[in-house]
Amino acid sequence: MSARIGFFVGKGGVGKSTLAAATAVQAALAGEKVLVVSTDQAHSLGDVLGAPIQPGRPGGESEPVRILAEEQGGELDAVELDTLALLESAWRLAAPVLAVRFPESDLNDVAPEELSAVPGIQEVLGLGAVADLAGSGRWDYVVVDCASTADALRMLTLPSSFAVYVERSWPRHRRLSTGLDDPRQAAMVALVESMHAQVARLAELLAGPDVGTHLVLTPERVVVAETVRALTALAVMGIRVNEVIVNQVLFQDDSFEYRNLPEHPAFDWYAARIGEQTAVLDHLAAATGDVKLILTPHLAGEPIGPKALAQLLDQARRRDGGTPPGPLRPIVDRESGSGLETIYRLRLQLPPLDSGELSLGRAGDDLIIGVGAVRRRVRLASVLRRCIVTGAALRGSELTVRFRPDPLVWPAGADGGAIGGDQ
């Protein structure tokens, strides 16, 4: 049985590693067997846990390090993945196949380090390693300390995009029927099949009910702006967000009177900072549709080690609100008319956004939704594939796209079609 997986995502410096480690400690103290994994090449997980962790690969020389063992059965292990080592291992398998298929190339002379500049390749290999760890049966919960926001989003969204584009550029039925009598071509097909199967497995894993992300931020305007974009991108790409954690919040002591304070730079700074944080949190609520927040305190000292990390979450407060926006779920129905005059509509609940950020397009059987720099292909229901788009409207956070039958491909005499099919 695969473990639950929680990905901690956030801008560098917001305390992402600290919150990931604290969550892992809390789960272990509750009796679960937990693994906390760092996929960030700038590893700091061992520093936060107060224990040396040797970066390594699952199954390689470095095994997860035991951090905590509780009498009630809870355990905490930690590992820092070396994604460059994963890349070297994968390239050793792929390079000979590619070199045979393309004999005039110099692929055998390419060092794995040269491929590390290819966007997303190390992130996806790291994600594959996380999936293997979660599926090993050794742990109940795997907590992942991701790299900074842009790298983490690439890791979480690339599998589904890659699977779609491989299938569109070289469909499986063509791959399996091309040059099977040519050993070089057969080896190439086998390599692509293996890659496609791996990324499809990862895409399916990320869409599963036991996987979610935890967005970590600090109450600062620049950080909030990036977090809102990340929240929107994850929803559009179909990745579930479990919670939004605001770190380093200055709490007011309810037993203390904050008015008429003596004139002193320390009091002035504290009062101004609390006011600024309150305004930023209000802005965050407005920009995200008032999602519920977990607020962790700004401590005088760094929380290092399991005991201090557990206390950090014990002191956290919660701000009520709605659940973070979930993955897109298209709803298709018939709005009016019959035959060639039928109007169908596709409705999608989007995260809060400015209409100027939204773009729409169509490519064959897919609706392409763009929000900022993120693009998502949504497979149209079978009835809509025989229709043309007549218009779209965004009201609040609900997007409605309307279709009518295309007379060139619509079955003669048909009165509408079945609602459904692949999304």
What role is predicted for each listed range?
Residues S62, L84-E88, A300-G305, R385:
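A short acidic, often aromatic-flanked loop/helix-cap motif at beta-alpha or helix-coil junctions
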Residues A200-S355, G364, A373-S382, I388, ...:
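C-terminal lobe/tail of nucleotide-utilizing enzymes
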Residues G396-D406:
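Long, intrinsically disordered, low-complexity Ser/Thr/Pro-rich regulatory/activation regions
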